[in-house]
Amino acid sequence: MASYEIFITFGIYLVFLMAIGVYFYSKTTTHESYVLGDRGVGYWVTAMSAQASDMSGWLLLGLPGAVYMSGLTEIWVVIGLALGTYLNWKFVAPALRIQTEKYNSLTIPSFISQKLNDNKGYIRTFSAIVILFFFTIYSASGLVASGKLFDSLLGIDYKWGVLIGGGTIIVYTFLGGYLATCWTDFFQGCLMFFAIIVVPVVAYFNGG
């Protein structure tokens, strides 16, 4: 069982995330501000938020486990991911920003539908279903990571870990929308970056 200091730290962490949602609740006064933050989130926050959401439990739990089991052959995953991320932000993101502003689109399905003059909404419906299907699977993997973290670190039952992690996300997203999501991800992304840099160094010196 984890010490009470760890429980207190995790408690403060979860409360802080929900406090961000409460703070941005008053900032989301329109549909566009709730969905896209009025397109006013800076590139640092946007980039860190996107990468924290994209990597999340996979980067800190899945990839280290894969490297431990398979060795440095897993480094190709990192190289491919880094290259793909760079190309995405270099070429896809700027063009997508310009085009979505041009069509005043709030979501990818609505942009594709407007771009291709899909008056009957077939493309919008199909693309929304595809996104919903695959993101449900990906989101589930993040909740699994949350459950495993609570179980291994705090000794809390896996199911309760999933519920606590998922419940926290639902609360701050429901309250603050896109802005709350971006800033909580930015905060967590900074923690992830710090952990990636510090933990290997500490492990190396402690392990001799």
Show which residues each predicted segment covers:
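Helix-loop-helix module between adjacent transmembrane segments
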Residues: 76-173
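Membrane-interface "cap" regions at the ends of multi-pass membrane proteins
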Residues: 1-60, 173-176
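Residue-level recognition of pore/gate-forming positions within transmembrane alpha-helices
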Residues: 14-17, 53-54, 81-85, 131-132, ...
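Extracellular/periplasmic helix-exit of transmembrane alpha-helices
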Residues: 94-98, 202-208
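Membrane-interface helix-loop-helix modules in multi-pass membrane proteins
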Residues: 35-104
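Small-residue-rich segments of transmembrane alpha-helices in multi-pass membrane proteins
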Residues: 43-49, 114-115, 188-202
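Helix-coil boundary and interhelical linker segments in multi-pass alpha-helical membrane proteins
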Residues: 1-5, 65-76, 152, 205
